[in-house]
Every structure is written in C-alpha cells, then in structure tokens.
C-alpha cells in the first residue's frame, strides 16, 4: 500500500477499459464487403446453425458478423452495413449485419419487429 507522500507524487493509475467493438472505431455503424458467407455451430446447449458473414470493413478490419432473421441474399462481394452487438452462443461474433440496407435485403412479409429486420409496412386491406 503506498504512503500518502507516494500518492501525492505519482497518483493512482486509472484502469483502461477494453473496447468491445474495436473494429468499429467508435462509430455507430461501418460498411464493408463480404469475402465469405457461411454457417457456424453455436456453443452448447444450442445446436441450430448460425448464419455469419466474414466482413472486411472500410477501415481494413476483418470481422465476423451475424446475419439476423430467416433467410438472406448475401453472397461474396456483397456490401453490408455493420452495427455492434454480440451473439451470445457464437464465440468471436461481436457484430450484426443491418437488414434492409445496401445489398442485404429486408425480410418480406414480416409483421412484428419490422424495424429490426428492414421489413416494409404491410398493406392493410
């Protein structure tokens, strides 16, 4: 334990907080190109394959991003917009693709939670 004199001379060193989404460079979103689209098996006890895309961001970072919702149209060289947010059962996947922006289409015929999946408002009868 330091003495009072040592604290006056040097002070205490602040702990540095680690950045969870370092690849985003403090930005809310970043765009990138998909060199690869694949599936990955999650951690136990879950088992359904998770759709992920490897994305090369505009700042040259390579990350894995989750593709939310049922079905997608992503291929190699597709442009996507990325936001933060990890997938709890997929190690190393710390971001999400945003649906309905750039080359990633929204989900058609989605009624609930439309804003999260880029779905258009349904036509009322």
From Swiss-Prot:
Gene3D superfamilies: Nucleic acid-binding proteins. PROSITE patterns: RIBOSOMAL_S12. GO terms for molecular function: structural constituent of ribosome. Keywords: Mitochondrion, Ribonucleoprotein, Ribosomal protein. It is found in: Mitochondrion. GO terms for biological process: translation. Residues 10-23 have a biased composition (Basic and acidic residues). CDD domains: Ribosomal_S12. InterPro entries: NA-bd_OB-fold, Ribosomal_uS12, Ribosomal_uS12_bac. It holds the Pfam family Ribosom_S12_S23. Residues 1-50 are annotated as: Disordered. One of its GO terms (cellular component) is small ribosomal subunit. HAMAP family: Ribosomal_uS12_B. PANTHER family: 30S RIBOSOMAL PROTEIN S12 FAMILY MEMBER (PTHR11652). Belongs to the universal ribosomal protein uS12 family. Protein S12 is involved in the translation initiation step. This is Small ribosomal subunit protein uS12m. It comes from Petunia hybrida (Petunia). The gene is RPS12.
